[in-house]
């Protein structure tokens, strides 16, 4: 079948590029034929594009876009090559018509690159600041002790921000005790005042007089109490809170007192102290003595949560600044007399306690330098004692430790010997060998241990740091085992934290070290009851060692509180090696409570710390 199409039925409409040119259909094939040449029907823009392109774009047959801000095309600018544009009068006018105002506002590629470089520099600086302010924990296995204290705060000097890498030994030990022994009891909500019933106390009067004598003998030097008459005069206490606090501290030397009586005494004292802190100013000197004693021994009873010594000493320091007039003068303006000696001794004890618990809990230290300058003035008086010098030396030691811990550069350098510590040793060398039972060396080794553990957060695999941690931990425990029981019972709570932290480090790195069992047994024999700090430290060390030895991978250990069924009592000594003799059942004589520790309990290789180390327990934080 054939279809015929006439010319009139098929018409093509082709747009004309020029009004003077006409396009017609030549035949029925559908092809058009122009009466002008091919050049006349091309768009004008295509002709001008070839004339305005630079030499490089023309050779490469690429689009040549002229940068409105310069005399070069964008391709040549991005490649940073010379751009040769033809000299035409229409070039700039044509480019201005092609680019809109929005296009002209776009910066060049080079400027955008410069902006990106500046942004990357700022971002890198911000990332470094974030790293400096956050704990850096390596991807290696973290031990049981590490997981117990991952959140960090730390001590600082004069209100500076806490260091991001400082350990928290006191907080760590308290968390481990809550884990192993259960959470402490919640204190009753009711409060008590210093009424007549509080003044009389819950102890028998004759027993109270005996306790006051024991207090003067073992604790009085801390707060300038040399005679029972300083506390109890004319059959009446000079200050009820001081009197009751003295009896409470001395009760550890008389283990026959029922624990329920001691607990009731402790709760009344605690409530009274809270009420007194909000009394009108200025505060009595005797009351400040009692608050200082409670700051030094905050964990007398462990059934309830211990008093926060950092907070208690801080508030007491504020009261002392108001009550002690000499603190508002320059140190050289006043002469140190007998009255000022007693107040300076109290002031130094508060400052030292604030420093120790600020570092131990990784909290700020806010005492201004002008107040700290009064501390050494106590040594100017002829009545200054060895303990006074030791206290001033410890204040200087903890200040140096706090400054070093808050210097990230020094901690990252992982130094083995610190110049500031060495200068301190030279300055106080006469006190380091002054008395056999002095705790000054314990504090020195403890501060060094903290610095090494802080540095290990940046270089946790450093063998020299591990060796120094073990060496200082062994020195602390070995020195402590040489102390008489009667002397150890009078140690402030900070000393027990030092010994406990050293034992935990040994458990963390080398749980088979024999010193662990020896110090655990020593603490258990030392504790007069299960509520004493020594007993709880002994059990914490025992339980942590058991977990470290039984669990090859610390991360697989399950954290949880254990009930009373897992707790030990003083009659169950079968879980420990026979290092010391069995405790005596008759406590009628106080001397029977204070046996000597034989020298053979110390290890022969005191300085040999290159023994077998378990890599799984080399932690970044303790």
UniProtKB/Swiss-Prot annotation:
It is found in: Nucleus. Its main location: nucleus. One of its GO terms (cellular component) is nucleus. InterPro entries: prtT, Zn2-C6_fun-type_DNA-bd_sf, Zn2Cys6_DnaBD. GO terms for molecular function: DNA-binding transcription factor activity, RNA polymerase II-specific; transcription cis-regulatory region binding; zinc ion binding. Gene3D superfamilies: Zn(2)-C6 fungal-type DNA-binding domain. Keywords: DNA-binding, Metal-binding, Nucleus, Transcription, Transcription regulation, Zinc. Residues 54-83 bind DNA. Belongs to the prtT family. Transcription factor required for protein utilization and degradation. Regulates transcription of major secreted proteases. PANTHER family: FINGER DOMAIN PROTEIN, PUTATIVE-RELATED (PTHR31845), TRANSCRIPTIONAL ACTIVATOR OF PROTEASES PRTT (PTHR31845:SF34). This is Transcriptional activator of proteases prtT. It comes from Aspergillus clavatus (strain ATCC 1007 / CBS 513.65 / DSM 816 / NCTC 3887 / NRRL 1 / QM 1276 / 107).
